[in-house]
């Protein structure tokens, strides 16, 4: 049998040589063993059980072949929770947590009854908000049926009472004349021109339906903003994640359609434009 320290040393040398994330080996091993990072290091001189060693070898080979750690383990952290992720949904990004935090800050100050999360994917935004504010009604939508399967499983696993609807953006709610006080969205916003700058890990594994949009990445925003008037109450707050080059253009879309509202571009922790909010607060 092999010691944990020996296995990690060998794996990390391979990762270093290939220019890959050297934390990947530890993450794969600790997750499969059900240990925290500190617990793994306390056991560093221990010999691995054959089943754990075999599982690590299989996982490590998949990672070296280009599969993201989150898809291998089928889990990803977001906002203090562990979410199920599959190839049908995007891997949660830390930047999206900042949009959730902004929405939470608004919810703490203003009475809101109905919240809608558009392009929900794995359900991370809707579920995080429902866990923080169990008294509000939360609906989440996506055009992808496979993504909604994952989102429903996450809601069940995390005991979050969220309603899920399969629809193209706001169409179902527009047809049913439903109205919301708050709408959050993390839509596809990457342009085709940006593909050359993207990691192969993303391009080869994550669903393109959730990544790319036409018209320089703005096509989904244009349809979304144009139809908001059919589904918003008179007092509302809208927050959308954006690409770091899209702030002014998305702001202009909101200002053109809703000239008497407050539209703000917010920067992320790296000082890049990351989300835009549009609000009309009457209460």
UniProtKB/Swiss-Prot annotation:
It comes from the Bacteria. Gene3D superfamilies: DNA helicase RuvA subunit, C-terminal domain (1.10.8.10), Vaccinia Virus protein VP39 (3.40.50.150). Its EC number is 2.1.1.297. The keyword Methyltransferase applies. It catalyses: L-glutaminyl-[peptide chain release factor] + S-adenosyl-L-methionine = N(5)-methyl-L-glutaminyl-[peptide chain release factor] + S-adenosyl-L-homocysteine + H(+). This is Release factor glutamine methyltransferase. Substrate binds at residues 186-189. GO terms for molecular function: nucleic acid binding; protein-(glutamine-N5) methyltransferase activity; protein-glutamine N-methyltransferase activity. Belongs to the protein N5-glutamine methyltransferase family. PrmC subfamily. Keywords: Methyltransferase, S-adenosyl-L-methionine, Transferase.
């Amino acid at each position: 049998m092999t010691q944990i320290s020996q296995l990690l040393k060998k794996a990390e040398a391979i990762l270093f040589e290939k220019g890959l994330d050297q934390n990947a080996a530890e993450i794969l091993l600790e997750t499969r063993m059900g240990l925290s990072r500190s617990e793994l290091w306390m056991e560093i001189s221990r010999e691995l059980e054959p089943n754990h060693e075999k599982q690590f070898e299989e996982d490590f080979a998949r990672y070296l072949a280009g599969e993201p750690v989150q898809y291998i383990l089928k889990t990803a952290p977001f906002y203090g929770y562990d979410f199920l992720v599959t190839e049908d949904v995007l891997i949660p990004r830390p930047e999206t947590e900042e949009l959730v935090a902004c929405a939470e800050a608004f919810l703490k100050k203003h009475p809101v009854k109905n919240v809608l999360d558009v392009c929900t994917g794995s359900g991370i935004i809707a579920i995080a908000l429902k866990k923080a504010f169990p008294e509000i009604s939360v609906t989440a939508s996506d055009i992808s049926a496979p993504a909604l399967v994952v989102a429903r499983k996450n809601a069940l696993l995390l005991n979050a009472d969220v309603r899920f609807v399969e629809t193209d953006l706001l169409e179902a709610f527009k047809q049913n004349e439903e109205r919301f006080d708050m709408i959050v969205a993390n839509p596809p916003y990457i342009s085709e021109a940006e593909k050359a700058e993207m990691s192969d890990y993303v391009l080869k594994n994550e669903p393109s339906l959730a990544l790319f949009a036409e018209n320089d990445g703005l096509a989904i925003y244009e349809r979304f903003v144009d139809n908001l008037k059919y589904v918003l109450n008179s007092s509302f707050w809208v927050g959308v994640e954006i690409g770091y080059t899209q702030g002014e253009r998305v702001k202009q879309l909101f200002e053109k359609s809703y000239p008497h509202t407050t539209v703000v571009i917010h920067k992320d922790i790296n000082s890049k434009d990351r989300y835009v909010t549009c609000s009309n607060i009457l209460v």
